[in-house]
């Protein structure tokens, strides 16, 4: 399993719901957790490894148990927002502050098919929102005006020998 990097079109795909949570899906989740940990990330969504599945994994910190989110749906967000510097494993080295709702209520299934509805706030809520965006083909840089987005991406694109806007 390998990471997919910007500007790969696989990062822009809206994922499909998972109909059967089976050993194949559990294996994907396990490998995604390993890749996320090796890469030093706190979240990883299926499109970031080239999978067209509504699946992401999260580990808020090195001491936390990894969480698997299958067919997730944010059903409520707080009216209170917070700003925090975000980055993305698929766009290494690019970081910038982004305003997001401070808390979310999310419905999902775990790797065993058990359904959960939980409320999260602060950093975990931010990670969940970031990974949910990936499942809809949205990257954190998409929230910025084109001029700022291009400025943030220019060094990244140049470093990879890609043409920047």
Curated annotation (Swiss-Prot):
Transmembrane segments: none annotated. Fe cation binds at residues 88, 130, 134. Disulfide bonds: none annotated. One of its GO terms (molecular function) is peptide deformylase activity. Pfam families: Pep_deformylase. Its cofactor is Fe(2+). Belongs to the polypeptide deformylase family. This is Peptide deformylase. It comes from Borreliella burgdorferi (strain ATCC 35210 / DSM 4680 / CIP 102532 / B31).
């Amino acid at each position: 399993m390998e990471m997919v990097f910007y500007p790969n079109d696989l990062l822009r795909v809206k994922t499909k719901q998972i109909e059967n949570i089976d050993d194949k899906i559990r294996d994907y989740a396990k490998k995604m957790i390993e890749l996320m940990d090796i890469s030093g990330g706190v979240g990883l969504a299926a499109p970031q490894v080239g999978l067209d599945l509504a699946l992401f994994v999260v580990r808020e910190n090195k001491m936390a148990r990894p969480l698997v989110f299958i067919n997730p749906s944010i059903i409520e967000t707080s009216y209170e927002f917070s700003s925090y510097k975000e980055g993305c494993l698929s766009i290494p080295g690019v970081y910038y502050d982004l305003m997001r709702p401070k808390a979310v209520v999310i419905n999902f299934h775990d790797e065993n098919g058990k359904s959960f509805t939980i409320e999260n706030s602060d950093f975990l809520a931010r990670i969940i929102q970031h990974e949910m965006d990936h499942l809809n083909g949205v990257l954190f840089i998409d929230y910025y005006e084109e001029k700022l987005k291009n400025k943030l991406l220019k060094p990244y694109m140049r470093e990879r020998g890609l043409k920047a806007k």
